[in-house]
């Protein structure tokens, strides 16, 4: 007898690891060669009415078939040893339940097979494997013994074979062989000798029983085959099962073909997930019903457009077909959740109470009248016409003046949600428009993210530091903002990740910037520009008294009103310890004082009830900054001008002197910029050309060199506003006339002697007032700027408005000459 163990016939084995007797490995049937007429009844005549019974777990033995069985139970081991010793046949039956350890008659199928023990193998792991070959079927009538092993009374059953001339049965056997080989080929490349053995085996009893033993079915179905005594009927039933199993194999192969392109050969887990995915497509089922149900419930409450609903439903169906462990599952889930979590057509109700809005804005911010006025105007229009598009405002000005915090107050005044995006250093366009979903880690842009965070479609949206945007090879974010900030386009803003248009027309965008020069012109055109200028000293004192001092007291745990800060003290802090346009540094200085006071309170030391100016040295140290004061008119050529800086207004002295020389030499010192140098040259040329008009001797220009100096040479200075100051200084130097006391001036000049307007008037005027100036000379066109300044800030000042240089000289210079004139 030749014995073959065919590894690749695994598909025809018992289901899998269930084919065990206790601790058994995978069991494979053995294909044997036999004669055409062999009926496997050799030695059957020696079998009596009683025979030893070997119960098998989940295994059914058929006549003629050789089957390896691993023996584990002590009773089974005892039975095998005695049967081998006596060279006797045994009865093999299948248990109904695999878990039964010590079966009785009711636990066994009563139809079994008489078997011969072909070989006993001692395995390396200590287990024992026996090879059994079936002989003839029998009926187990009763169990006569249960110890040391099972024995029972049996009745031998005969198989009915068709006539050899039965062509139908012959065709049936041929079909069974072909189908068996097809099943082998559908799973793997079968060995040629295996195919040859199946095709050329002429023993019909063996062919039928071998196939019955190897079908991938449960023991109950195999037992039904064993019960059938008519071989032809058994073959028909076998063919039915083979056809069914072959269709299943084909379906598995089809599933593998469908998923083959998506399979990563190195990831077994991914392969299994793709199989599950295709199975779910075939069955139309879904194992994530709860999560899908929640998403559908959310979607049912949305007021979104029809096209959005269509996209959502399409993407949700994709999600239904994915397994939770699939790599695409989390990506698809995130996308669907982003769609459903957006506030489609959901708006917070605006508060149209204008007095409430004004109170909120005045409470949180001192000054800023233009900005407040614009917000109140917008609120009034919304009250009258509810569907108006929100304005797009750009607040620009120096740092620390409250541009960003103003946005929060506007949101509170309107009772809208507040969101803020910092654009400083942004250089990737995808941060605005979002990343396309093809990229790993793709997400919505910052606009859509913050709309989702706000939960409404009409928040107050702060685009902070819009002037700090940069661009590189990843695109230009400023260009992406063109769509966001265009009222004619942002009703259909397209985010690359969502790939759906979203309406931003009701969002109130407020951009903040320090420098408009770095913002592209198309972007500037889309925004309403509102300047938030630096605070003057009086405004800083008010802000400190009303906001900063109470805030810092609360932050440092001091009782409200326990320490007072007189306005004079706050004024000294502003002038001597800070130099800024906003109030950030002022806030830090007040916090420093509060820390020292808190330390005293914690140490049970007494603290003053009021902080006086002379106490500031103890808390803040030595004075950090000093402001220029008017120094009189005792020197020819010294004139007081006015300048504007990023931290406010300043007075500016222009000094001109003459020295003996060849003439026509102009020296400029004081770290002057190009524009200021040109103003000095222009002033000298003008008075030279109009020397007679100013009563200047022409010979002075030929024999005297001119030196113009602006003090504080370490500080760069530039701008045209010192034009009339330089003319006055040079005329005073060439005529040795005194300059009028307590007078300052600012204005640009032309070669024709005209005076042009300049900017920063508010800051310059307040700087002059702090320096003790009483009179100011301004361009006639700057008169409109004076009207926008609060009257209390102008008290004690006299303004002279001029349009040409002669008027300036007549107002500024006295007829009286200085002491000890040069000529």
From Swiss-Prot:
Pfam families: AAA, Lon_C, Lon_lid, LON_substr_bdg. Residues 633-815 form the Lon proteolytic domain. Residues 51-246 form the Lon N-terminal domain. InterPro entries: AAA+_ATPase, ATPase_AAA_core, Lon_bac, Lon_bac/euk-typ, Lon_lid, Lon_proteolytic, Lon_Prtase, Lon_prtase_N. Its main location: cytoplasm. It is an enzyme of class 3 (hydrolase). GO terms for cellular component: cytoplasm. Gene3D superfamilies: 1.10.8.60, 1.20.5.5270, 1.20.58.1480, 3.30.230.10, LON domain-like, P-loop containing nucleotide triphosphate hydrolases. It is found in: Cytoplasm. GO terms for biological process: cellular response to heat; protein quality control for misfolded or incompletely synthesized proteins. ATP binds at residues 397-404. Keywords: ATP-binding, Cytoplasm, Hydrolase, Nucleotide-binding, Protease, Serine protease, Stress response. Its EC number is 3.4.21.53. Induction: By heat shock. It catalyses: Hydrolysis of proteins in presence of ATP. SMART domains: AAA, LON. Belongs to the peptidase S16 family. Homohexamer. Organized in a ring with a central cavity. ATP-dependent serine protease that mediates the selective degradation of mutant and abnormal proteins as well as certain short-lived regulatory proteins. Required for cellular homeostasis and for survival from DNA damage and developmental changes induced by stress. Degrades polypeptides processively to yield small peptide fragments that are 5 to 10 amino acids long. Binds to DNA in a double-stranded, site-specific manner. This is Lon protease. The lineage of its organism: Bacteria, Pseudomonadati, Bacteroidota, Bacteroidia, Bacteroidales. The gene is lon.
């Amino acid at each position: 007898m030749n014995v073959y163990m065919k590894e690749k016939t695994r598909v025809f084995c018992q289901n899998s690891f269930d084919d065990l007797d206790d601790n058994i490995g995978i069991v494979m049937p053995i294909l044997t060669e036999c004669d055409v007429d062999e009926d496997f009844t050799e030695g059957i005549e020696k079998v009596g009415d009683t025979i030893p019974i070997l119960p098998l777990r989940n295994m059914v033995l058929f006549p003629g078939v050789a089957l390896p069985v691993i023996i584990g139970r002590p009773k089974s081991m005892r039975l095998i040893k005695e049967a081998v010793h006596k060279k006797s046949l045994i009865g093999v039956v299948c248990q109904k339940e695999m878990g039964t350890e010590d079966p009785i008659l009711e636990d066994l199928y009563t139809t079994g097979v008489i078997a011969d023990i072909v070989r006993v193998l001692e395995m390396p792991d200590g287990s024992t494997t026996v090879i059994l070959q079936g002989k003839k079927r029998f009926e187990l009538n009763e169990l006569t013994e249960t110890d040391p092993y099972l024995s029972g009374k049996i009745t031998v059953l005969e198989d009915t074979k068709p006539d050899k001339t039965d062509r139908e049965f012959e065709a049936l056997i041929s079909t069974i062989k072909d189908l068996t080989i097809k099943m082998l080929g559908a799973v793997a490349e079968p060995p040629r000798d295996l195919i040859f053995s199946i095709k050329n085996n002429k023993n019909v009893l063996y062919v039928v029983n071998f196939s019955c033993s190897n079908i991938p079915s449960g023991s109950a179905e195999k037992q039904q085959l064993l019960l059938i005594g008519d071989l032809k009927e058994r073959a028909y039933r076998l063919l039915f099962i083979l056809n069914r199993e072959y269709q299943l194999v084909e379906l598995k192969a089809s599933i593998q073909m469908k998923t083959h392109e998506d399979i990563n050969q190195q990831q077994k887990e991914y392969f299994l997930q793709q199989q599950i995915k295709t199975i779910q497509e075939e069955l139309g089922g879904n194992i994530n019903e709860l999560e899908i149900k929640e998403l559908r419930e959310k979607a049912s409450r949305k007021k979104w457009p029809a096209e959005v609903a269509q996209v959502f439903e399409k993407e949700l169906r994709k999600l239904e077909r994915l397994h939770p462990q699939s790599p695409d599952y989390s990506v698809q889930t995130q996308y669907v959740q982003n769609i459903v979590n957006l506030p489609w057509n959901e708006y917070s109700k605006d508060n149209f109470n204008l007095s409430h809005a004004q109170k909120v804005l005045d409470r949180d911010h001192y000054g800023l009248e233009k900005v407040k006025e614009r917000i109140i105007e917008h609120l009034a229009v919304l009250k009258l016409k509810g569907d108006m598009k929100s304005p797009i405002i750009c607040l620009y000005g120096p740092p620390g003046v409250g541009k960003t915090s103003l946005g929060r107050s506007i949101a509170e005044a309107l009772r809208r949600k507040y969101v803020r995006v910092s654009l400083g250093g942004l250089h990737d366009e995808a941060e605005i428009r979002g990343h396309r979903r093809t990229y790993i880690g793709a997400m919505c842009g910052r606009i859509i993210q913050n709309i989702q965070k706000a939960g409404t479609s009409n928040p107050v949206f702060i685009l902070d530091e819009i002037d700090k945007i940069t661009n590189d090879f990843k695109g230009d974010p400023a260009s992406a903002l063109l769509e966001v900030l265009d009222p004619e386009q942002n009703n259909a803003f397209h985010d690359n990740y969502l790939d759906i248009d979203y309406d931003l027309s009701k969002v109130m965008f407020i951009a903040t910037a320090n420098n408009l020069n770095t913002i592209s012109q198309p972007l500037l055109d889309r925004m309403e520009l509102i300047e938030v200028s630096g605070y003057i000293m009086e405004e800083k004192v008010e802000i400190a008294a009303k906001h900063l001092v109470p805030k810092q007291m609360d932050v440092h745990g001091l009782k409200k009103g326990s320490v007072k800060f007189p306005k004079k003290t706050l004024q000294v802090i502003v002038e001597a310890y800070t130099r800024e346009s906003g109030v950030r540094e002022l806030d830090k200085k007040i916090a420093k004082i509060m820390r020292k006071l808190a330390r005293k309170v914690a140490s049970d030391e007494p603290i003053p009830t009021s902080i006086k100016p002379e106490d500031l040295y103890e808390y803040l140290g030595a004075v950090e900054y000093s402001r220029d004061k008017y120094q009189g008119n005792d020197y020819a050529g010294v004139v007081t001008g006015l300048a504007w800086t990023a931290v406010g207004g300043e007075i500016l002295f222009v000094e001109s002197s003459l020295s003996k020389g060849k003439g026509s030499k102009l020296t400029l010192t004081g770290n002057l910029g190009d524009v200021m140098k040109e103003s000095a040259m222009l002033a000298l040329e003008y008075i030279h050309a109009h020397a007679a008009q100013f009563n200047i001797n022409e010979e002075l220009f030929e024999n005297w060199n001119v030196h113009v100096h602006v003090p504080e040479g370490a500080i760069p200075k530039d701008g045209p506003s010192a034009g009339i100051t330089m003319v006055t200084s040079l005329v005073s130097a060439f005529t040795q006339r005194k300059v009028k006391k307590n007078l300052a001036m600012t204005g640009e000049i032309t070669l024709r002697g005209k005076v042009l307007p300049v900017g920063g008037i508010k800051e310059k005027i307040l700087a002059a007032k702090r320096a003790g100036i009483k009179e100011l000379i301004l361009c006639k066109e700057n008169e409109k700027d004076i009207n926008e300044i609060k009257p209390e800030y102008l008290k004690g000042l006299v303004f002279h408005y001029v349009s040409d240089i002669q008027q300036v000289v007549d107002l500024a210079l006295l007829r009286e000459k200085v002491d000890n004139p040069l000529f």
